[in-house]
């Protein structure tokens, strides 16, 4: 696969302008404007915290559970926003594709970059919330950006692949939204993975092979508490530790290849 020339000055300028435009269009007409970038995941966190922590008493045995839950919520919201916006990006920019010629991948990267910027703002909120709740800052926090990069590449690969299909079959974006609602409960955002491990150790192992679950658990481990179950401290087989990363590599590679193959038809189909 030919690697996109991101370093090209022309491509960088175009990417920057598209990201700025995405931000303006996304919050255009709303009273709170850019504050929604933070408010959406915070509102979801508040609902989940009241229902599962206060009413159902979940997570009482987890250190700093509110931070634990907030980190999972913010990471999930990032993945959800990144893929949903990325999948619809080409169709949303169909008018631009028909007017000028430029690398099509920039459209998807701009949409996912906008989601990444939103996430970084929310990550700052998580860090502040963690410190307020007694989490001691450490150098291990510096590992978190590299873990997040894995989730971004996974989201980008999915966006490339499904976004290319969505140009011709517009049902894909709707199907993905339904799939995401189901996937939310298959990823340890609300509940601790220890609940799954206690019920079925095999199921917990399968859960941890999911790159999304692996990223969420790893971020919690390095950011909040080293009592968090992760792929590399729970799975005894060392080769299995690399499965989530391998899945990400396969998805970003196949997604990029398929997107490149289909991109020549985007202008007439979008």
Task: Describe every region a protein language model picked out.
Residues 1-270:
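Hydrophobic transmembrane alpha-helices and immediately adjacent juxtamembrane helices
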């Amino acid at each position: 696969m030919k690697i996109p020339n991101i370093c090209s000055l022309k491509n960088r300028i175009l990417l920057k302008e598209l990201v700025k435009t995405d931000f303006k269009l996304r919050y255009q007409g709303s009273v709170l404007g850019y504050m929604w970038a933070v408010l959406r995941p915070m509102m979801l966190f508040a609902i989940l915290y009241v229902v599962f922590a206060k009413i159902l008493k979940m997570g009482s045995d987890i250190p700093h559970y509110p931070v634990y839950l907030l980190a999972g919520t913010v990471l999930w919201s990032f993945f959800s926003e990144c893929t949903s916006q990325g999948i619809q990006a080409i169709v949303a920019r169909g008018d631009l594709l028909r007017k000028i010629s430029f690398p099509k991948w920039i459209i998807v990267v701009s949409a996912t970059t906008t989601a990444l910027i939103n996430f970084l703002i929310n990550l700052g909120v998580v860090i502040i919330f963690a410190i307020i709740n007694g989490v001691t800052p450490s150098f291990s926090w510096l590992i978190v950006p590299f873990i997040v990069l894995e989730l971004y590449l996974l989201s980008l690969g999915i966006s490339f692949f499904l976004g290319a299909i969505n140009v011709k079959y517009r049902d894909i974006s709707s199907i993905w939204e339904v799939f995401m609602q189901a996937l939310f409960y298959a990823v340890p955002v609300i509940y601790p993975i220890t609940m799954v491990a206690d019920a079925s150790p095999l199921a917990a192992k399968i859960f941890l092979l999911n790159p999304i679950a692996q990223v969420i658990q790893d971020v919690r481990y390095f950011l909040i508490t080293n009592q968090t179950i992760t792929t590399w401290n729970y799975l005894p087989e060392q080769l299995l530790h690399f499965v989530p990363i391998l899945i990400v590599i396969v998805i970003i590679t196949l997604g990029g290849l398929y997107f490149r193959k289909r991109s020549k038809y985007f202008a007439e189909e979008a």
